[in-house]
């Protein structure tokens, strides 16, 4: 098997990014367009913003189609793009909503993934890189096993994790039956520029927005719950490698840092970057949330040659600088 592109020759390819107007998706679109690839963005704009694609549109290599993943127009949009590689990032990402409305979560995260895979096959796509969840597919891990690798058995903590694991398995069946090349990236808690401060899964963005608005920061639970925070540009590196590396097909890979950071430690680190910030308020813990998680990402290094580059201090500084600029421009907050 050969790589899909030879970056030394500047070969472009046809790509498609679902959720490409969102936080991670738009960063990936920027990278692909800058590398000379044609990018079709499929996004229903329920949470994504076309403003995130302003620079990508200026390249002349990016087009957007507003499509519901589970709707009848998806196959036509994918067929029109004829992508060699599909990057599937569109998702329902709110763990709390998966608990309160598991039918909606399954419709988007399971049926939507099946629909994307089917459309990709029909369009002649060779590879599909899927945004899975390293924070939920393993359930509540044994603390003594942290950081956990991909051999850790799957567990059940919330419907979101169940849906992501089911989607991975469906993609594996498409590989077995139809020859699709799936790559599932089990992401840690991704943060960075363009993350929605009004969303449900972006604690760094929420904290930045609260600090900049001089509003109190609320931490759910005692703040000692840990996450593996990974910077968005490092995650984009992993997606690009997943789409191009000859050894990637069939892999299910953790993408994180291997470092546990508590919510309290995260907030303190952000206060140090900002240079100000009051003590947080506390509220009851939310159902379905993990107590601790950290991901062993050595396998991603072996398969993709990937490793995270940004440590938490650097990533938070870059995220804070972006959020500060956006507030001054009137784009964030309110």
Predicted regions and their residues:
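Hydrophobic "lid"/C-terminal helical patch
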Residues: 28, 239-243, 267-270, 297, ...
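Amphipathic terminal alpha-helices
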Residues: 2-4, 312-334
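C-terminal "lid/loop" region of Rossmann-like NAD(P)-dependent oxidoreductases
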Residues: 222, 250-253, 261-268, 275-292, ...
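Conserved mid-core alpha-helix of short-chain dehydrogenase/reductase
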Residues: 115-119, 229, 234-241
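Non-catalytic, hydrophobic alpha-helical segments
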Residues: 235, 239, 255, 266, ...
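Glycine/proline-rich active-site loop of Rossmann-fold NAD(P)-dependent oxidoreductases
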Residues: 165, 190-206, 215-216, 220, ...
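N-terminal Rossmann-like NAD(P)+-binding domain of SDR-like oxidoreductases, especially those catalyzing
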Residues: 2-190
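Residue-level signal for the nucleotide or nucleotide-sugar donor/cofactor binding architecture
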Residues: 48, 100, 108-111, 151, ...
């Amino acid at each position: 098997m050969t790589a899909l592109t030879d970056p030394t020759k500047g070969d472009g390819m046809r790509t498609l990014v679902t959720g490409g107007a969102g936080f991670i998706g738009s960063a990936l679109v920027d990278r692909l367009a800058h590398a000379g690839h044609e990018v079709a963005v499929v996004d229903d704009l329920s949470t994504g913003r076309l403003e995130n694609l302003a620079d990508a549109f200026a390249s002349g290599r990016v087009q957007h189609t507003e499509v519901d993943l589970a709707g009848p127009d998806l196959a036509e949009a994918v067929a029109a793009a004829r992508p060699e590689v599909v990057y599937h990032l569109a998702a329902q990402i709110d763990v709390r909503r998966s608990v309160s409305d598991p039918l909606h979560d399954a419709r988007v995260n399971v049926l939507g993934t099946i629909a994307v895979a089917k459309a990709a096959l029909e369009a002649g796509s060779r590879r599909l890189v899927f945004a899975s969840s390293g924070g939920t597919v393993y359930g509540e891990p044994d603390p003594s096993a942290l950081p956990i690798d991909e051999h850790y058995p799957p567990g059940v903590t919330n419907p979101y994790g169940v849906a992501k694991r089911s989607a991975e398995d469906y993609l594996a069946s498409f590989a077995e039956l139809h020859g699709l090349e799936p790559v599932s990236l089990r992401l840690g808690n991704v943060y960075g520029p363009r993350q929605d401060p009004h969303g449900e899964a972006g604690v760094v963005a929420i904290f930045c927005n609260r600090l900049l608005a001089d509003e109190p920061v609320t931490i759910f639970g005692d703040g000692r719950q840990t996450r593996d925070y990974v910077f968005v540009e490092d995650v984009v590196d992993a997606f690009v490698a997943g789409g191009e590396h000859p050894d990637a097909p069939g892999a299910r890979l953790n993408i994180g840092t291997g470092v546990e950071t508590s919510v309290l430690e995260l907030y303190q680190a952000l206060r140090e970057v900002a240079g100000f910030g009051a003590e947080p308020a506390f509220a009851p813990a939310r159902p379905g949330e993990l107590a601790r998680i950290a991901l062993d990402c050595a396998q991603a290094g072996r398969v993709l040659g990937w490793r995270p580059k940004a440590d938490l201090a650097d990533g938070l500084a870059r995220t804070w600088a972006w959020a500060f600029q956006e507030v001054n421009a009137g784009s964030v907050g309110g």
